[in-house]
Amino acid sequence: MGSEKKENGVILEVEPKPSNGFTSKAVDLLEKIIVKLFYDSSLPHHWLSGNFAPVKDETPPVKDLTVQGHLPDCLNGEFVRVGPNPKFSPVAGYHWFDGDGMIHGLRIKDGKASYVSRFVKTSRFKQEEYFNGSKFMKIGDLKGLFGLLMVNMQMLRAKLKILDVSYGHGTANTALVYHHQKLLALSEGDKPYAIKVFEDGDLQTLGMLDYDKRLGHNFTAHPKVDPFTGEMFTFGYSHTAPYVTYRVISKDGFMQDPVPITISDPVMMHDFAITENYSIFMDLPLYFRPKEMVKNKTLIFSFDSTKKARFGVLPRYAKDDKHIRWFELPNCFIFHNANAWEEEDEIVLITCRLENPNLDVVGGAVKEKLDNFSNELYEMRFNMKTGEASQKKLSASTVDFPRVNESYTGRKQRYVYGTTLDSIAKVTGIIKFDLHAEPDSGKTKLEVGGNVQGLYDLGPGRFGSEAVYVPRVPGTDSEEDDGYLIFFVHDENTGKSFVHVIDAKRMSAEPVAVVELPQRVPYGFHAFFVTEDQLQEQAKF
């Protein structure tokens, strides 16, 4: 195994060693028998159709794209978004979270734009390329007795060294972050993958980060970088104790000792938050329950509507969890937080709150199930003096992928930018909330008025993705909303994909720029903007 030395860290070259001999073929045959006997192959794969379907190949940089309008100088850099794009067809089930990570990038410089798409070359991806087919267990398989059998197939392949799991088996398909001169591709079931961004916008997977072997657990897809200190705060969750482990990484890339967080059961913890002095963990009742998977023929994570939602507030440099304060609120689940800050005796969390989540809906084979999804913007307050917790609804449904001006991460800010959705997956518009304004409690749908300061509607048959805020001038000295929102859009009427840029202050229906892309860009997950300074900084390594 090779490595490339970095200050306070080593990027591991991912060189798995799978085996494709007689034993591998025998296990493949056994799997085919199990699939034939226990899997209903007539079920359609909604997440592999329409614009959820993967693109077959990578696209090297395509230059001088058509730009309607103008691309402001502050957008010099590369806008990147990652999402699931399976290289090979599934053996049986498929969940939206299962696909191989593919990064779509728009390189912008001096008003011109180039497009590129590249797979993240994970250990999983490399091994399935070696076999020329799908070999790793999928979330979409983990249902009922069939799920248990597929878990055992994965364990058998690992035990017989057909698959090499020494580098993990994640997809790097969920989110992106920049820290310590590196762009990282993330999925919460694995360690980070480092991505190099070239001057022409091209992308290359350098390898995996394990922070000099100090990282021995999974790494969330939603770490937080403090813009004032340069530190990155992160955690990982597991189905074995300790169920949650908290980490602090210095601005120089050194990972501090692990801090186990004590909770009673293994849960899905997709996100967390930081303030200037605290980190906030969410012990929400979406439990890892393999027995219920088999008994009830559900996915391996199931939601318990009888349990409270718990929020743990920990001093962010704590060496253990002795001083964590737990607060309870009514039952819910949260995929994504917008931001958090301290306000006198209270910790304030701005988040998207979901009642009665059902991951079967996210991975559902039946398209109509997608309409049963309600996600709303909430303000939650945790009083560190009295121990009381309260919450306030800030929006109608459905809002997700909340973003802020990241110069204010962990500090009080005014504006939240989110996506409006007609289902769990299709983004119909970009919305701007003013937290200084009161919500219009009489409204049952999202429209301008009250605390909704703007709404950019994509129009019939057009759907978008997470919008990233890019300030005109970095920092907190300029107006908080003096900048732009940039995001991918797909037009299902024409089959064409675009990048839109809109004015974050005005939220006008007229975009600042629209860039036509040379190929279809499937719907995906989270996005990030690599500034020109960051692009040049990481190019030195």
UniProtKB/Swiss-Prot annotation:
One of its GO terms (biological process) is carotene catabolic process. The keyword S-adenosyl-L-methionine does not apply. Binds 1 Fe(2+) ion per subunit. GO terms for cellular component: chloroplast stroma. It holds the Pfam family RPE65. InterPro entries: Carotenoid_Oase. GO terms for molecular function: carotenoid dioxygenase activity; metal ion binding. Its EC number is 1.14.99.n4. It catalyses: all-trans-zeaxanthin + 2 O2 = 4,9-dimethyldodeca-2,4,6,8,10-pentaenedial + 2 (3R)-hydroxy-beta-ionone. Fe cation binds at residues 222, 270, 336, 526. Its cofactor is Fe(2+). Keywords: Dioxygenase, Iron, Metal-binding, Oxidoreductase. Cleaves a variety of carotenoids at the 9-10 and 9'-10' double bonds. Probably not involved in abscisic acid biosynthesis. Belongs to the carotenoid oxygenase family. This is Carotenoid 9,10(9',10')-cleavage dioxygenase 1. It comes from Pisum sativum.
